[in-house]
């Protein structure tokens, strides 16, 4: 779990909460604000992640005040979650999330407008694309590992071809 930002204002947001499932590598990119409180993080988590995955056994986060507050410690204790903030000035502890942050930046760089104030509208698509890529560690996409099938994207090639040359070319 990591906060990415501050970014240029986009629909009232200036930060992205990035959450990565360490088993399936499924990632969530949630627009928020740099002043979000730990209660706000907990609410985002409840509304967008808990409803799909339940309560995690362990959370690795950076040293942000939102993640190491008394509230978060109490929340983790009540829910029996092992909190594991990364070592200060040692982001490699949560290297997987740091890598995902880089991918989000690369994706947004390709799609945002020149004023960079529309990045929040691209987050859902960035999340979908990221979760549809095959991960080198699992040899499957996070989407497939979570749902057991590959998503339809509306641009799938036909599986049966009537023209023999096309059939030969696709095989």
For each feature predicted by the language model, list its residue ranges.
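An active-site-proximal beta-strand-loop segment
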Residues: 1-28
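Domain-scale segment recognizer with a strong primary affinity
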Residues: 26, 38, 42, 46, ...
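Residues immediately flanking
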Residues: 1-3, 22, 32-34, 47, ...
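Residues embedded in well-ordered secondary-structure elements
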Residues: 6-8, 48, 119
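Phosphate/ATP-binding catalytic cores across multiple sugar-kinase/actin-like superfamilies
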Residues: 52
């Amino acid at each position: 779990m990591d906060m990415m930002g501050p970014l240029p204002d986009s629909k009232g947001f200036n930060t992205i909460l990035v959450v990565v499932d360490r088993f399936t590598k499924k990632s969530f990119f949630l627009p928020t604000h740099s002043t979000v409180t730990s209660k706000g993080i907990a609410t985002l988590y409840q509304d967008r992640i808990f409803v799909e995955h339940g309560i995690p056994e362990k959370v690795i986060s950076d040293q942000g005040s939102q993640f190491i507050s008394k509230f978060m410690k109490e929340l983790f204790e009540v829910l029996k979650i092992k909190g594991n903030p990364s070592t200060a000035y040692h982001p490699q502890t949560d290297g997987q999330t740091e890598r995902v942050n880089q991918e989000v930046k690369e994706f947004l760089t390709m799609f945002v407008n020149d004023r960079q104030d529309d990045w929040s509208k691209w987050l859902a698509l960035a999340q979908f694309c990221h979760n549809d890529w095959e991960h080198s560690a699992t040899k499957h996409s996070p989407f497939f590992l979570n749902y057991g099938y590959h998503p339809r994207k509306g641009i799938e090639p036909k599986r049966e071809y009537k023209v023999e040359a096309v059939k030969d070319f696709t095989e």
